[in-house]
Amino acid sequence: PMPAQNRVHPAARTAPLRVFVDNMTALNLAPCPKAPWAGGRVLRHIAYGDCSPAQWLNLYLPDTPLPAPLLILVHGGGFVTNDAESRQARLMYRFFRDRGYACATVNYRLAGEARFPAAIEDVKAAVRFLGQQGQTYGYDTGRTAIWGESAGAYLAAMAALTDDDTFAGTPCLGE
């Protein structure tokens, strides 16, 4: 049996969950509908690779004077669901767009289409593509950050923490 000092009282096990749910309810987070772009400029389904039709990104440019800092958003979904137009991506690009950031939402090959490390290859290819296109689209490549949610957080970390050659040497390696 577990020592008494390591046991968690049954009421304490549910307290964090209850606090989380109460806080989320207090925020009154209504679903984010697929509303039309309400400012700035949007460029949809820009191809950043040629391995798959899934290799695209959306670019949202603010109304503020360019070049704007760029935030790259990578969607979650456990590597098996969602895309660059997911609810999380819509919430984030709207938040940052309203504060003067350019946002790129990156789509990548899911596990049902390609094996590991395809998603990492795709996100890194998108980052390289975006790094080369700042003048074309009007964002500042010197002020770029990457952010992800769930599986997207893992992919963002891999893109940020691996050198440029890692997962880049063989095109379409994850097929």
Which sequence ranges carry the predicted segments?
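Primarily recognizes the serine-hydrolase "nucleophile elbow" in alpha/beta-hydrolase
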Residues: 125-175
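N-terminal cap/lid segment of alpha/beta-hydrolase-fold proteins
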Residues: 9-66
